[in-house]
Regions:
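Short, surface-exposed polybasic-and-hydrophobic patches located at secondary-structure transitions
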Residues: 119-130, 153-171, 386-395
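Flexible, surface-exposed loop regions and adjacent strand-edge segments
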Residues: 116-123, 290-296
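N-terminal "mature head" segments of proteins
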Residues: 35-49, 63, 103, 135-142, ...
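Flexible beta-edge/linker motif
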Residues: 57-117, 128-145, 265-267
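Compositionally biased, proline/threonine/alanine/serine-rich low-complexity intrinsically disordered stretches
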Residues: 384-431
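Small-residue helix/turn framework positions
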Residues: 64-65, 69-72, 101-111, 166-391
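A short, amphipathic edge element
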Residues: 47-54, 307
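N-terminal type II signal-anchor transmembrane helix
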Residues: 1-47, 402-411
Length: 431
């Protein structure tokens, strides 16, 4: 027999064997209706909540494929998957240990408050890791996936993840479709090490760096990383995630991040970041400090231009959403300067600081509070009078003599020092 004929015969025999195997598998598999019922029961056991599946379909040819349509959890804010398509490796079905070559998720909604319920369920929080170094899922693709934050802010993402063993991403990319300037986050693994190069494009700038994962006793994972934000327009960056920023301007700095947990969900929930930043120049949006002072707080709508803005931003994911804490804030607008601190959480801002009308002047304490979209500024009455006098005197004397007549709560504040300031009336008292 010729060599070519032998190869042809060999391929034919192999094809026949594979066909017989697939027929055997088909014999084991249920009807679509039975299949949907089995998947529903399995999902409810793993997730710990009731679920519904609109329809389910499986096919062995031309390749093993499973399609789910209209998956929903029975929750106040349901988790929804419009369509999930899973492509299986045919050879792995024979061992009853299926491996997914690719899973595609389209038109999904993941409310953060609903997903958190699954973290306490072992079946959802601890996916099967397979045998040894086996890979149970090679690639995950998602399109039009909406993540809904604790505060109800919906953000749509597209992305892909290629997995190595133990669910380690080999390559991952996350995008915000239709956003300009674009947002992309890319992770690339360094060989087999639990270390990844991170490249982020957002707000017209970049934040490149690296992240690493370490395993500790008891199965706890520790995530750490460093990023270098460069030229990121703050308002544009937050607008990319359907959020409003209190300031605008291009920011640069250094960021460190960390998280601890036993699963990806726990790592995300515990994520902490610290960024030392500078924005030069910057603009405070929706608050005109000059107007607030000159009108004794009756008017404050507008903006405040700053020659520079520096400080430290700490973020912490909590059960009630992300908390952002600004400390060591220093801003300069011409001869005037401001120091202070602020906390932003659940759409509310609470800030306090000291306004210096001229170099060396006594500071006028102020507070800013309320919704981020429309905060209110407040200055103690005596300081209002001082601020108005100083504002009139500055063009003439070139100094802040008038401001020194102010009486801040607890005594005058000299130089650049800070002290806590309580909310004050918005009208000046008569002496």
């Amino acid at each position: 027999m010729k060599r070519g004929q032998k190869w042809t015969l060999g391929v034919g025999i192999a094809g026949a064997v594979l066909g017989a195997a697939l027929l055997a598998v088909a014999w084991w598999l249920p009807t679509d209706k039975e299949f949907a019922a089995r998947l529903t029961a399995e999902a409810e056991e793993r997730l710990g909540v009731r679920v519904t599946i609109g329809s389910a379909h499986w096919a062995l040819l031309p390749r093993p494929t499973v399609v789910l349509n209209d998956f929903r959890t029975r929750q106040t804010q349901p988790v929804v998957i419009g369509q999930l398509t899973a492509h299986l490796k045919a050879r792995t079905l024979l061992d009853r240990k299926p491996v997914f070559g690719r899973i595609e998720i389209n038109d999904a909604v993941f409310p953060r408050n609903s997903v958190r319920v699954f973290q306490g369920t072992a079946g959802a929080s601890k996916p099967d890791t397979g045998d040894g170094d086996s890979v149970l899922l090679e690639r995950l693709e998602f399109r039009n996936l909406t993540w809904v934050s604790h505060g109800g802010i919906a953000v749509i993402y597209d992305g892909e993840i290629d997995f190595d063993a133990h669910w380690r991403p080999r390559h991952a990319e996350l995008r915000r479709p239709g956003i300009s300037p674009p947002f992309t986050l890319t992770l690339k693994r360094d060989g087999d090490a639990d270390r990844w190069q991170a490249r982020i494009h957002v707000g017209g700038g970049t934040a490149h760096g690296n992240v690493a994962l370490k395993s500790a006793a008891g199965g706890t994972l520790h995530l750490s990383g460093r990023l270098t934000p460069i030229g990121i327009e703050v308002a544009s960056a937050l607008r990319s995630f359907n959020r409003r920023s209190p300031v605008s301007g291009k920011s640069s700095g250094k960021t460190v991040l960390s998280a601890d947990g036993k699963s990806a969900g726990e790592l995300a929930e515990s994520l902490r970041t610290r960024t030392v930043f500078s924005v030069n120049p910057a603009t405070i949006l929706r608050v005109d400090l000059e107007k607030a002072i000159s009108t004794l707080g009756k008017e404050h709508d507008g903006q405040t231009a700053l020659q520079e803005l520096t400080g430290q931003l700490d973020t912490q994911n909590t059960d009630n959403g992300m908390r952002a804490i600004y400390t060591g804030l220093k801003a300069r607008a011409g001869k005037r300067s401001v120091t202070g601190e602020a906390t932003v959480h659940r759409g509310q801002v609470e800030a306090s600081g000291i306004l210096f009308l001229a170099e060396g002047a006594i500071g006028a304490p102020f507070t800013v509070s309320g919704p981020v979209s429309k905060p209110k500024a407040s200055v103690p009455p005596a300081s209002y009078a001082a601020a108005v006098i100083s504002a009139a005197a500055l063009p003439v004397t070139g100094s802040g003599i008038g401001a020194r007549t102010g009486d801040a709560p607890g005594g005058p504040v000299e130089g650049g020092g800070q002290q806590p300031v309580a909310a004050a009336p918005v009208t000046a008292k008569e002496n």
